[in-house]
Regions:
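Extracytoplasmic gating/loop element in the C-terminal half of outer-membrane beta-barrel translocons
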Residues: 129-151, 561-661
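Acidic, glycine-rich flexible loop segments
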Residues: 32-73
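Surface-exposed beta-strand-turn/loop segments characteristic
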Residues: 1, 47, 51-52, 60-67, ...
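Glycine-rich, aromatic-lined ligand/substrate-binding cores of catalytic
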Residues: 532-569
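Extracellular/periplasmic, surface-exposed regions of secreted and cell-surface proteins
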Residues: 3-10, 15-20, 24-29, 67-123, ...
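Conserved small-residue
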Residues: 214, 423, 440-535, 566, ...
Length: 707
């Protein structure tokens, strides 16, 4: 609400909003990268999309099969292994404006915001995950089940369950309270109808207090009145693994900034403006040297259409302006990097034996006195054009950016007591072009047609990078970066064909051809990796058309993306079960000697091959991350099609309404184009299991009534 006090000199604006959301999602654990086996796995993954994609179509959807040594049915598991999410958000804001004179205005704004979210993971008694922790029907299962407890104090005893009854209840809560205050003063004046001067000053401070808690309740009996049932050996096992069954984390973020801007325009033709900002934060640690940083921006605009020589160009040209800006901006970097002074954290050292326990303090990150903000210089040139009384408008921007002091991990000689340190270790340059074209193609009384076209091209290169990581990080997920390649580049192992047995072979780091001598945890020699391309597109944009005829409005909106690569789903393995779906690539697999000359799809490894060839799993993991398992990420997508009808006023008035409309909308209905090598895989979706699903097709019918 807005209330005017003292006529128009004093204005009070009050805003309040609140939201609450409940959601239920499939139960999910965190994914893990195995650098030895070369796999990315997630235990007890019941993601419906992943299950539908990778499960055999011969399975009866109502039957139970064996998984994790215990009965499993996807529909039953989804009903007994789920997460309840609750999110609430409340914000109140008040702004007071005082117009001291017609040219000077001061304002003060205060806001408080509270956010709270909770995630409750319910793993019920009869769920597959809970039963896996007590499955020991036979001695073979008992010795092979990884979820049973092998008591180190009783070496002659068989493994046994630490969850003899009940299920598992996991809860995590996150709360954040932020307080913001901003005071500003502005001065606006015009001299002789030619000189326009705007001055603006601002002071702002904000504080954010965050609290995160987590808890794991083992043995909660969902089928017995939700009564806990746990045994002593559960805590013994957690102590031996140094596992914390509850946690509490508080963080306090404080920020302050002082800024001033000026803008001067002469005769509506030439405009220059600048900004100077001095901000500070405690995000980088307690050191005052890393706390404050000045940033600035200077820009100019030449409105060519206001020049006298432009008049003969009308009406073909209706507007023309040239823009130029140069700036220094900064970012505080990752939230976990705060070692401008040494960071000391408490911990419980692992001692193995449960009777030996002690708290301790550890230097988690040694001091980096030179730690500072991540910075960026940007030069931007823009051109705005209008034709035929602005029926056609074109806006173009070209930019060049130099990022420096980027924060990352650097490997040192360890003289300071730590090998890995966080610091400003990287630099990157980028350039790009952005274009926006709007046209009013047809404008008649009963029919209108408008088109909006957006095009963006971007290219970047990491020019300096002092860091090291494992080979598995370069070839999985969203890739990694090397000097001379774009940020977020995808690499692959070089596939060298199938051998005479149908086993895939690759180029090893020493230059030899191998099937199993691939070290996924290698951090130094990456000469056997092939650069595939960036995981982020270099060309993006959209094309939208709006047609209006009488009361009907048709909107057709498409998006496109080109220039990136995607990793195909890692579906190959040295062993499969009857529960696994066979993808269509298997129709072209190696079957008989000599097939290695006609196909790149490896053989389904036999039991004998698994016994005779040690570490055969490495060959199939490497094949999943080889250059033959990469496709282009290019696509053109029909993003939205909608048809709406606004009923005439005569109809709505008869119904005692001020307005009545009906709208049908289809969102993400289909892909117009994508790489055939994807074979139906969504180029915008990276399947990580858990709760990840591709963008769904949505069809919405909306009736809008106003009174």
């Amino acid at each position: 609400t807005t209330q005017h006090i003292l006529k128009d000199k004093l204005t009070l604006n009050l805003i309040g909003n609140a939201s609450y959301r409940e959601q239920r999602a499939p139960g999910s654990l965190s994914s893990e990268v195995d650098p030895v086996f070369g796999t990315v796995k997630r235990d007890f993954d019941i993601n419906p999309y992943s299950y539908a994609l990778r499960s055999s179509r011969t399975l009866d959807p109502d039957e139970f099969y064996t998984r994790n040594y215990t009965p499993f049915n996807i529909k039953d598991e989804l009903s007994k292994n789920y997460m309840d999410l609750n999110v609430s958000d409340v914000k109140f804001q008040a702004e007071l404006k005082w117009k001291i004179t017609p040219k000077v205005e001061v304002s003060a704004l205060g806001a408080i915001k509270y956010q709270a979210s909770s995630t409750e993971h319910h793993i019920e008694d009869s769920s597959n995950q809970a039963q896996a922790y007590r499955s020991m029907a036979t001695s073979i299962i008992q010795s092979n089940n990884p979820y049973l407890y092998d008591n180190p104090d009783e070496p002659n005893r068989d493994k046994y369950s630490i969850l003899p009854q009940g299920g598992i209840y996991k809860r995590s809560d996150f709360r954040a309270k932020s307080r913001d205050f901003r005071a500003s003063i502005s001065y606006n004046d015009t001299f002789n109808d030619k000189h326009i001067l705007n001055l603006f000053g601002i002071v702002e401070v904000n504080a954010i207090d965050r609290r995160a808690t987590s808890f794991q309740g083992w043995g909660l009996q969902y089928d017995m009145g939700e009564t806990p049932f746990y045994i002593l050996d559960l805590f013994k096992k957690q102590l031996e693994e140094n596992t914390q069954y509850y946690s509490l984390s508080n963080t306090r973020e404080r920020n302050a900034a002082f800024a001033g801007t000026f803008s001067y325009s002469y005769d509506y033709r030439y405009t220059i403006n600048g900004t100077l900002r001095y901000e500070g934060s405690n995000r980088l640690g307690r050191s005052r040297k890393a706390r404050w940083l000045p940033t600035w921006n200077i820009a100019g605009k030449w409105s060519i259409d206001q020049e006298s020589f432009f008049e003969p160009l009308r009406p073909a040209f209706s507007s023309l302006a040239l823009r130029l800006s140069y700036s220094l901006t900064a970012d505080r970097g990752p939230t976990w990097v705060n070692n401008s002074t040494a960071t000391i954290y408490p911990l419980n050292p692992w001692r193995g034996a449960t009777e030996i326990r002690e708290p301790a303090l550890s230097i988690s990150a040694p001091e980096n006195s030179e730690l500072t903000y991540e910075k960026k210089h940007e030069l931007n040139v823009g051109l705005d054009m209008g034709f035929l009384d602005d029926r056609i408008t074109l806006s173009m921007d070209a930019y060049r950016r130099n990022n420096f002091d980027l924060i990352g991990n650097v490997v040192t000689m360890g003289l300071g007591g730590a090998v890995d340190k966080q610091g400003n270790v990287a630099e990157m340059k980028s350039q790009g072009v952005e274009l926006s074209l709007f046209t009013r193609n047809i404008e008649r009384k009963d029919f209108k047609w408008q088109t909006n076209f957006i095009f963006a091209w971007m290219d970047n290169e990491v020019t300096k990078l002092k860091t090291m990581t494992r080979m598995i990080d370069y070839i999985t997920g969203t890739g990694y970066s090397m000097e001379g390649t774009p940020r977020g580049s995808l690499f692959s192992l070089k596939f060298k064909g199938l051998n005479e047995m149908g086993i895939p072979t690759f180029l090893a780091a020493d230059g030899s051809i191998t099937s199993t001598n691939i070290q996924f945890q290698e951090t130094v020699n990456m000469s056997n990796l092939v650069y595939e391309g960036p995981v982020d597109p270099t060309i993006t944009g959209s094309l939208g058309n709006i047609f209006k005829w009488k009361g009907f409005t048709l909107n057709v909106f498409m998006t496109y993306s080109f220039g990136n690569v995607v990793r195909l789903d890692p579906i190959f393995s040295n062993g499969y079960s009857d529960l696994t779906a066979m993808p269509r690539e298997f129709a072209n697999r190696y079957l008989n000697p000599g097939d290695e000359r006609r196909t790149n799809v490896p053989v389904i490894a036999s039991t004998r091959q698994n016994n005779d060839i040690s570490n055969l799993y490495v060959a199939y993991s490497a094949y999943n991350y080889s250059d033959v398992r990469v496709a282009k990420g290019d696509f053109i997508r029909m993003k939205e099609i909608s048809l709406s009808y606004d009923f005439p006023q005569s109809v709505s008035s008869k119904l005692r309404m001020s307005g009545l409309s009906l709208k049908f909308q289809a969102t993400n209905p289909f892909l117009i184009y994508s790489d055939k090598k994807l074979q139906g895989q969504d180029p915008e979706f990276f399947n990580t299991g858990g709760v990840a699903v591709p963008m769904p097709k949505q069809f919405t019918l909306t009736l809008r009534v106003s009174f």
